[in-house]
Amino acid sequence: MLTEREIELMEHALGLPHAWDTHGYHYKRHGKQYIKSYRNYFQTQVGDENYYVWCKLKEKGLANSWINTNNGKCYPYFEVSDNGIKELENQQNYIIRYVK
């Protein structure tokens, strides 16, 4: 079971808050709610409150991570894993479609 904060961060990484406000990014078909995701990443900093939430998601197998170096600084990035998307869909009762 995902916490409210975990859901919020995962939806933000997938761009879902924006999708709810954009025409055509959410729709119903055959009685099911669909929502289109236009990204899958979240940049944070070590020591930040969000960093530790994402680390817990990664431990559960619901997120992946990598380090991006920019101007000599290292920034941790996270993405929602396939298992994380399935868990989010099950708990929130919608189906996520990725738009590139």
Indicate where each model-derived feature is located.
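Short amphipathic alpha-helical interaction segments
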Residues: 43-60, 64-66, 75
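Surface-exposed polar/charged interaction patches
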Residues: 16, 20, 60, 91-94
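Short, amphipathic alpha-helical interaction segments positioned at domain boundaries
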Residues: 72-100
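Hydrophobic beta-strand residues in large extracellular and virion-surface proteins
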Residues: 10, 63, 78-80
